[in-house]
């Protein structure tokens, strides 16, 4: 038997009270659920005073103490006190703008309820409680914000500091059945990865990157689609998480995909935010929902030309306001080859924007002693990548490439065919501001928080 949904309505003073009352009666006539009452969120054009709504609406009404702001905190309080399942928004402009609606929706979803308005129904991510070990999730507020690089780094830090982690990864190129890659046991050479790609696998998928760069057990999973709130249409990560329970690990990292959120209950969370993202994608839409489910925000790409100081400060302020006490680290990425490349002539391919490639080249040459003879920022664009490879590959001894996108099926294949060595490149997050001097200390603190919650 399906449980009856407990519904809380949002009403305004821009409707005549009889009109709103009839709409509330329709809720029960349509058998949508049990109406627990309504929150008055503002507007005075068609009412004499807010108290009139309370007297005449015919249901329990909560009135805001402020007439100037949408009472988001009150809505959340009523959701929690009345065990509300659905918030039904019966308001309209000018009381609520589209921005207001997403602000309300983020708060409602964070409180565990659904948000409905006449032409949209948003559900929070349904987290499956299947893990039997302490765990943390790593999610992003968008694509290409450095989530997998931070995830691999987090796993390396936790492994080096004795937490014995494994990682469960959800990706758009993941396998039909969850796949275990024992990064702690097998040697993931370019030839090995190319052979896997020739079997039809996406051997540059995030779980292969994590296995190569972190050297820990990895479970690769797939997902399709990502909704506004981060829900997927299909995913096999629940099965993957159950597999993680059986691996020889004491801690589980669960990695999302793009802005999609893995539907696995964890004890703590880290959200990756790109300083180059539009502010409205972070503090607007359902960005705050993602931020609120985490304990630490790592803001990446905190340097020009990705973002100037003013933009970085705005992003940090936006994250802190959305996160309500969330800790923040500002960071930049720097490439680190996984092998010695001193004295080598290298072609460097990356997903980094073209504007920042020269800085990465300078870092590689100064820190690792190689000479970069050509670059391509087109690792995620196969046709352009092939053209760049044709242009520079004859001048190089080795190919330096991130392990993502077309790194294996195009870049590695062409390099090996041309007789070049292939060296994969890690992207290491380096703290440049915020609440911690080192990213590693920040992620370890989240791991400790996860353990405390798991044991508590």
UniProtKB/Swiss-Prot annotation:
<protein>
    <recommendedName>
        <fullName>Cyclic 2,3-diphosphoglycerate synthetase</fullName>
        <ecNumber>6.5.1.9</ecNumber>
    </recommendedName>
</protein>
<dbReference type="GO" id="GO:0016874">
    <property type="term" value="F:ligase activity"/>
</dbReference>
<keyword id="KW-0436">Ligase</keyword>
<keyword id="KW-0547">Nucleotide-binding</keyword>
<keyword id="KW-0963">Cytoplasm</keyword>
<dbReference type="GO" id="GO:0005524">
    <property type="term" value="F:ATP binding"/>
</dbReference>
<comment type="function">
    <text>Catalyzes the formation of cyclic 2,3-diphosphoglycerate (cDPG) by formation of an intramolecular phosphoanhydride bond at the expense of ATP.</text>
</comment>
<dbReference type="GO" id="GO:0005737">
    <property type="term" value="C:cytoplasm"/>
</dbReference>
<dbReference type="GO" id="GO:0036356">
    <property type="term" value="F:cyclic 2,3-diphosphoglycerate synthetase activity"/>
</dbReference>
<keyword id="KW-0067">ATP-binding</keyword>
<dbReference type="InterPro" id="IPR016557">
    <property type="entry name" value="Cyc_diphosphoglycerate_synth"/>
</dbReference>
<comment type="similarity">
    <text>Belongs to the cyclic 2,3-diphosphoglycerate synthetase family.</text>
</comment>
<dbReference type="GO" id="GO:0006094">
    <property type="term" value="P:gluconeogenesis"/>
</dbReference>
<dbReference type="InterPro" id="IPR027417">
    <property type="entry name" value="P-loop_NTPase"/>
</dbReference>
